[in-house]
């Protein structure tokens, strides 16, 4: 599998996890926006960057955060759990990178409205 195919496959894994919990999702094809996935549930919008291994540059992070704030959406990063070959973890972006504060938090299923 090419890196593109692996990334696309993980985007679909993320979408399946969200749809199983009642989210309506749409994938942004060919990375034309800073968000890979748009998800909505109970009137709340979530923009998601699906990163198989969680790697994201500071510039991409900050651009994604600004994009979400402008749209009124919750900025989320999904990644594969460390050392695992399956599953999805969700992280809420809290701050810009380099602010001296922890810029993310791991979301439990309850935090993300998944139960």
Question: Predicted regions: what is each one?
Answer:
Residues 1-28:
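Acidic-basic catalytic patches of nuclease active cores, encompassing PD-(D/E)XK
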Residues 5, 72-115:
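Domain-level recognition of nuclease-like catalytic cores that cleave nucleotide substrates
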Residues 17, 66-67:
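Alpha-helical scaffold elements within enzyme catalytic domains, especially in hydrolases
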Residues 18, 37-54:
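Conserved catalytic cores of phosphodiester-cleaving nucleases, focusing on short active-site segments
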Residues 23, 44, 73-74:
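Short coil/turn segments at beta-strand junctions that form active-site/ligand-binding loops
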Residues 29, 54-65:
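Active-site-adjacent loop/helix micro-motif of nuclease/hydrolase catalytic cores
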Residues 31-34:
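Short acidic/glycine-enriched loop/turn segments that link adjacent beta-strands
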Residues 36-37, 77:
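Short beta-strand scaffold segments in enzyme catalytic cores
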